[in-house]
């Protein structure tokens, strides 16, 4: 396994599909004091996927690292500073194939992007995930991230019914 910085001239615009499996989700429920989150198991495991591309045009000067086995890219992480609020956004972190997960590759990528974020002088690192991506939520929590917000209708008007609500997670650096 080797971590390498990815060249935007080579990777920009390349497409990939991110997949994950989940056994449940965190329902965001209104309550008297605001909202609460409650874990709910699905009746059967669910597989989710979405298509994306490297070095999205919406990012300002993104940096990306790949994890390679030989010449094969098996995962990557991408991030960029948000100058207006001095936060570093991790826009993607993904190990492409299920058989390569739980081998420390995601942790190696997280370590690389956290070093990049610290070097940028950012006050905080932030990222987005979904309430149904329970493995990602657990991974981010192990890395010191906490839930800092949510958007009930970020992806569609049916996100709560789809059990896929956007959550923002963050980790203070300074």
Could you say what each language-model-derived stretch is?
Residues 123, 130-137, 142-146, 150-174:
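C-terminal "cap" of GNAT-fold acetyltransferases
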């Amino acid at each position: 396994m080797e971590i390498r910085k990815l060249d935007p001239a080579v990777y920009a615009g390349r497409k990939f599909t991110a997949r994950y499996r989940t056994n449940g989700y965190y329902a965001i429920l209104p309550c008297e004091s605001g909202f609460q989150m409650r874990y709910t198991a699905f009746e059967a495991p669910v597989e989710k996927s979405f298509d994306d591309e490297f070095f999205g045009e919406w990012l300002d000067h993104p940096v990306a690292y790949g994890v390679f086995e030989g010449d094969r890219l098996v995962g990557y992480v991408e991030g960029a500073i948000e100058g207006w609020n001095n936060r570093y956004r991790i826009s993607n972190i993904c190990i492409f194939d299920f058989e390569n997960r739980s081998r420390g590759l995601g942790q190696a990528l997280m370590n690389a992007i956290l070093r990049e974020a610290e070097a940028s002088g950012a006050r905080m690192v932030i990222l987005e995930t979904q309430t149904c991506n329970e493995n990602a939520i657990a991974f981010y929590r192990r890395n010191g991230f906490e839930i800092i917000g949510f958007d009930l209708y970020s992806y569609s008007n049916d996100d709560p019914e789809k059990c896929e609500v956007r959550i923002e997670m963050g980790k203070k650096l300074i």
